[in-house]
Amino acid sequence: MRTSQYLLATQKETPADAVVISHQLMLRAGMIRKLASGLYTWLPMGLRVMRKVEAVVREEMNAAGALEVLMPSIQPAELWQESGRWEQYGPELLRLKDRHQRDFCVGPTHEEVITDLARNELSSYKQLPLNMYQIQTKFRDEIRPRFGLMRGREFIMKDAYSFHADQASLQETYDRMHQAYSNIFTRLGLDFRPVQADTGSIGGSYSHEFHVLAESGEDDVIFSDSSDYAANIEKAEAIPRETARLAPTEELRLVDTPDAKTIAQLVENYGLPIEKTVKTLIVRGAEEGKLVALIVRGDHELNEIKAAKLEQVADPLVMATDAELREAIGAGAGSLGPLNLPLECIIDRSVALMSDFGIGANIDDKHYFGVNWERDLPVPQVADLRNVVEGDPSPDGQGTLVIKRGIEVGHIFQLGTKYSEALKCQVLGENGKPVVLSMGCYGIGVSRVVAAAIEQSYDDKGIIWNDALAPFQIALVPLRYETDVVREATDKLYAELTAAGFEVLLDDRDKKTSPGIKFADMELIGIPHRIVVSDRGLADGNLEYKHRTEQDAQALPLNEVLTFLQARVRR
């Protein structure tokens, strides 16, 4: 491809509303253009990258035995009402009416549609297992679209759904898809981690997320430094570093604390070590009108996903209002604690191992210091309530936990029978009796992968693509292309490289475009291999080669270029 026949839409300045690197560089490199909030047009340069992601995804899905389909973006409300998600999904679901006033939505996901397809097409266990996928545009009406493609409203996604007569078959396909996802992200040259995850709004019983590691990531990815254990922050089990509770050394005492509305103030103004403090958080209970106290150490954070799974706690988690606290306890949020608290208490594992600690006295501006379990109050129910912190013991007993930032690019679920039961999707089993199908669900954010790859690999000059993802593998840059000797050598090399199967972008812009601008554009776009053709080099029988990640260029004999690139470029 020649730049004279291509839309080379690079920009020198960074748009003011672009915050994250991938958004900035995709705009500057001429890969996307913003149409409206959260909506982007893919330009030819960006689309080449996305098509490469799609190709790898398609190859690995096909190799794993999945069958490609294409479902409508617009879905009838009746299906979502059958599953119960029409109201549950919330305002992110874009709803609309047709001219006949029938309700529809723009699909953010396709569990209902695929289950409807399966219940109409499948009748016997002999047709199972069946795994179908599509690569299609999705829409979620995000309240605050941001970060370019990382959190847009419209995006490209690969979603697959599998159907099974039993759990063993589901597990087999799930494991196959887990491996397929690992193959995909490995082939794309990404540094990634598969982690145990919560199933979230999709539902189901078992899931894994696939995260590309990047400092700009929105999610915490937790993994052991000595084993294969890995989980996201919602799922990671928090194991206390302490193994036993120390014996009491202090007496219980009531202290006036007018300057301790927060943990930070309690530590700063009263000299209490933060690991000797607790947070008493009051939430609404599962039973109407009931409140429940959740207690974590002062230097730890409540994990709301874990808390909402407790049978006594309302899901989703809702914090009690100040008025509710006053009515139930008679004190404000900064003065609460488990001693003499007229509510059911659930404490974190780390709290159960504390001694000589401080708590709110359930009286405004008063705290108890020197509190000890069993001596001053009984140990209530103990549960895993907190987020892990770096250095915690790994739950598998091997090593300690490391926390990195990650960008979620894939998620696989074992849905079980959640949707098949709701939509009555069943077949005749081997014994001739109806069997409700078990389902799996497997998603990859195709457009998000492109942005995540940039977040993982860039420098101050622009994007650094690997060979698998680059829009073009080779940038061929002639200097003084208007001269016969340079033009003839360049055109001949371009023809040879193209015939050999390389993806080449020939920068044939005229002399009004300086060599510096040409080099800067190719580095901004991130093309991994650059060949420079100049009359001076040709006089010596050489070309100039430079890899995008290298500082210095090297002379390359003209007659060795093809052999060199065939060995260097990964195809």
UniProtKB/Swiss-Prot annotation:
Keyword Nucleotide-binding in annotation: yes
Compartments, as annotated in UniProt: Cytoplasm
InterPro entries according to UniProt: aa-tRNA-synt_IIb, aa-tRNA-synth_II, aa-tRNA-synth_II/BPL/LPL, Anticodon-bd, Anticodon-bd_dom_sf, Pro-tRNA-ligase_IIa, Pro-tRNA-synth_IIa_bac-type, Pro-tRNA-Synthase_IIa_type1
Pfam families listed in its UniProt record: HGTP_anticodon, tRNA-synt_2b, tRNA_edit
GO molecular function: aminoacyl-tRNA deacylase activity; ATP binding; proline-tRNA ligase activity
GO cellular component: cytosol
GO biological process: prolyl-tRNA aminoacylation
Annotated CDD domains: ProRS-INS, ProRS_anticodon_short, ProRS_core_prok
Major localization listed first in the record, in broad terms: cytoplasm
Keywords carried by this UniProt record: Aminoacyl-tRNA synthetase, ATP-binding, Cytoplasm, Ligase, Nucleotide-binding, Protein biosynthesis
Catalyzed reaction equations: tRNA(Pro) + L-proline + ATP = L-prolyl-tRNA(Pro) + AMP + diphosphate
Nucleotide-binding as UniProt keyword: yes
EC number: 6.1.1.15
Top-level EC class: ligase
Domain remarks: Consists of three domains: the N-terminal catalytic domain, the editing domain and the C-terminal anticodon-binding domain.
Quaternary structure note: Homodimer.
Similarity comment text for this entry: Belongs to the class-II aminoacyl-tRNA synthetase family. ProS type 1 subfamily.
HAMAP family: Pro_tRNA_synth_type1 (MF_01569)
Function recorded in the entry: Catalyzes the attachment of proline to tRNA(Pro) in a two-step reaction: proline is first activated by ATP to form Pro-AMP and then transferred to the acceptor end of tRNA(Pro). As ProRS can inadvertently accommodate and process non-cognate amino acids such as alanine and cysteine, to avoid such errors it has two additional distinct editing activities against alanine. One activity is designated as 'pretransfer' editing and involves the tRNA(Pro)-independent hydrolysis of activated Ala-AMP.
Protein name: Proline--tRNA ligase
Organism: Pseudomonas putida (strain W619)
Gene: proS
